[in-house]
């Protein structure tokens, strides 16, 4: 049972990060103490000192005496919250002093002011603001009470607080974009992703009378405005671009331009923008009192990540994770446009799949899939282009489940890694496939011999397609990792948990896991000259975390790049 003092101590610890301390030595000691509290099996002072010694933080007797001296000076647990408040207050003051120093340096410098300098200062100020605005963890009773009040309010006013797109079928399936949702809009080039986003932008601004922020990394503000004008005036985009308009058309453009000038639309066409910069700009915009309803990013692959990665696919994973965190932090839906990889061009059926969102990880044809408690099927002989049921893992419920049918498709030849555990179990898969480890999902090319890999064991009982994972999973160390050769590999698409068991390993099937909603655009006339479907675009709801998926059609006017209900 946790005492009131223990709860107070835990709350204080949660609020303080190691970098809040001024002295590096104190920061390192606090980090070691956190490791002892959060990860050690036995929480003790002895383990704390063992960690210090292992990390080479204590070299001699004098340093050991210094640590003992700090422990003797430690405040009583009933005053810990006051001391933690002092630590936080001093850290914020140091942040503000650093901002002041930076402002003085920039102001006195003879060089031209660069945007990155201002962004850095605003970022530090935002960080200070967020620390002061930190929300405490709420009890389940409080959350439920707030939820019931919210539901009762919605019932009375009968208005959906979600952001509607203006497309009847899309809104029917999704019930609108929810706050903190990350929505991915994907398609091959020229499918109309930007036009689709502009359609939604115009509708949201008209309905909500709120701001939409559009970060355009591909087009300039002028190019985007020409597209918006074409949609607004129902005029051929080429005519507007060339300026070949008759008098009536020209007067109409001027009239519509006056309307557009008052739109609550903010366009940022900065190049090489990062998720951190987007966060800073949006928060700065909100501090000005602007009511923002939606953020649009065009497009995902052109975003930069502050933490550079050796692998672009890994970097995109970091970006999507950052965008999801940002959407939750801002309590705003983020619509991110995305390209699909060109592998789908080699398929006979070019209708996009979730695995086309990025270079999908694949497994060797010689691997086996766990399809039930005792049955395994080798991909090469049993699974080619078939749909089969497989066992997958729910991290939320900590259980293994018999999944719905998993689709398998051949993706050609790729270089394959072979990972072998100390117990002799092995699996062959491509570099960007993920495996479950003690540290969560890790890509094959990021796994090393210090990692522990999740392995399925056979001493569990099957009950209604659910297995108790505490007796069915173990973690094994890695003996070696080899790069083998080019092999025929296969891609698997498993819903809803996006993973499966192969050769007893828990394998992620590389589907974009951070998005709440994935919308894909497909137009048959892009690949064929079939006139019957030229004016129609298929909209595929490929993933919907909070509801059903589905497919419907929209009319697409290529002349003015505008979508409308079919």
Swiss-Prot record:
GO terms for biological process: DNA replication, synthesis of primer. It is found in: Plastid, Chloroplast. ATP binds at residues 187-194. Its main location: plastid. Keywords: ATP-binding, Autocatalytic cleavage, Chloroplast, DNA replication, DNA-binding, Helicase, Hydrolase, Isomerase, Nucleotide-binding, Plastid, Primosome, Protein splicing, Repeat. GO terms for cellular component: chloroplast; cytosol. Residues 156-426, 308-566 form the SF4 helicase domain. The keyword Transferase does not apply. This protein undergoes a protein self splicing that involves a post-translational excision of the intervening region (intein) followed by peptide ligation. Homohexamer. Belongs to the helicase family. DnaB subfamily. A replicative DNA helicase, it participates in initiation and elongation during chromosome replication. Travels ahead of the DNA replisome, separating dsDNA into templates for DNA synthesis. A processive ATP-dependent 5'-3' DNA helicase it has DNA-dependent ATPase activity. NCBIfam families: DnaB (TIGR00665). This is Probable replicative DNA helicase.
């Amino acid at each position: 049972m946790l005492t009131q003092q223990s709860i107070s101590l835990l709350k204080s610890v949660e609020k303080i990060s190691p970098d809040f301390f001024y002295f590096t030595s104190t920061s390192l000691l606090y980090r070691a103490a956190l490791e002892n509290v959060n990860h050690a099996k036995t929480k003790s002072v002895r383990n704390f000192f063992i960690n210090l010694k292992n990390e080479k933080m204590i070299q001699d007797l004098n340093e050991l005496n210094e640590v003992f001296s700090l422990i003797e000076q430690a405040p009583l647990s009933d005053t810990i919250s006051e001391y933690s408040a002092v630590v936080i207050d001093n850290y914020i003051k140091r942040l503000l002093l650093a901002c002041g120093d930076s402002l003085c340096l920039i102001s006195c410098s003879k060089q031209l002011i660069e945007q990155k300098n201002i962004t850095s200062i605003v970022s530090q100020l935002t960080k200070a603001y967020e620390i002061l605005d930190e929300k405490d963890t709420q009890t389940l009773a409080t959350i439920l009470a707030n939820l019931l009040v919210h539901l009762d309010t919605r019932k009375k006013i009968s208005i959906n607080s979600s952001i509607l797109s203006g497309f009847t079928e899309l809104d029917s399936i999704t019930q609108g974009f929810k706050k903190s949702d990350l929505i991915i809009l994907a398609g091959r080039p020229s499918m109309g992703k930007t036009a689709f986003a502009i359609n939604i932008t115009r509708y949201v601004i008209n309905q909500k009378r709120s701001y939409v922020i559009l970060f355009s990394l591909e087009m300039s503000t002028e190019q985007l405005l020409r597209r918006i004008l074409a949609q607004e005036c129902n005029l051929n985009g080429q005519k507007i671009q060339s300026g070949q308009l008759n008098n009536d058309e020209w007067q109409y453009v001027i009239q519509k331009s006056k309307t557009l000038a008052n739109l609550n639309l903010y366009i940022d066409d900065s190049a090489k923008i990062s998720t951190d910069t987007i966060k800073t700009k949006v928060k700065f915009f909100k501090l000005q009192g602007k009511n923002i309803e939606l953020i649009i990013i065009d497009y995902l692959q052109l975003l930069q990540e502050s933490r550079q990665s050796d692998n672009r696919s890994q970097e995109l994973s970091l970006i999507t994770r950052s965008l999801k965190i940002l959407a939750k932090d801002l309590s705003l839906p983020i619509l991110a446009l995305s390209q699909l990889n060109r592998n789908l061009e080699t398929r006979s059926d070019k209708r996009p799949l979730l695995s086309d969102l990025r270079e999908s990880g694949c497994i060797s044809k010689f691997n086996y899939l766990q399809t039930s408690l005792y049955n395994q099927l080798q991909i090469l002989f049993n699974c080619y282009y078939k749909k089969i049921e497989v066992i997958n893992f729910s991290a939320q419920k900590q259980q293994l489940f018999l999944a719905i049918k998993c689709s398998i498709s051949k993706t050609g030849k790729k270089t394959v890694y072979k990972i072998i555990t100390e117990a002799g179990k092995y699996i062959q898969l491509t570099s960007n496939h993920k495996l479950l480890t003690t540290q969560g999902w890790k890509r094959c090319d990021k796994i090393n011999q210090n990692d522990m890999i999740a392995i399925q064991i056979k001493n569990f009982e099957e009950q209604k397609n659910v297995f108790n994972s505490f007796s069915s999973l173990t973690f094994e160390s890695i003996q070696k990792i080899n790069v083998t050769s080019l092999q025929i590999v296969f891609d698997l698409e498993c819903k809803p948990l996006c993973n499966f068991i192969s050769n007893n390993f828990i394998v992620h099937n590389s589907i974009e896991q951070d998005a709440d909603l994935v919308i894909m655009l497909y137009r048959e006339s892009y690949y064929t000259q079939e006139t019957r479907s030229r004016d129609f675009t298929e909209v595929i709801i490929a993933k919907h975390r909070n509801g059903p998926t589905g497919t419907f059609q929209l009319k697409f006017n290529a002349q003015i790049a505008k979508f409308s209900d079919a």
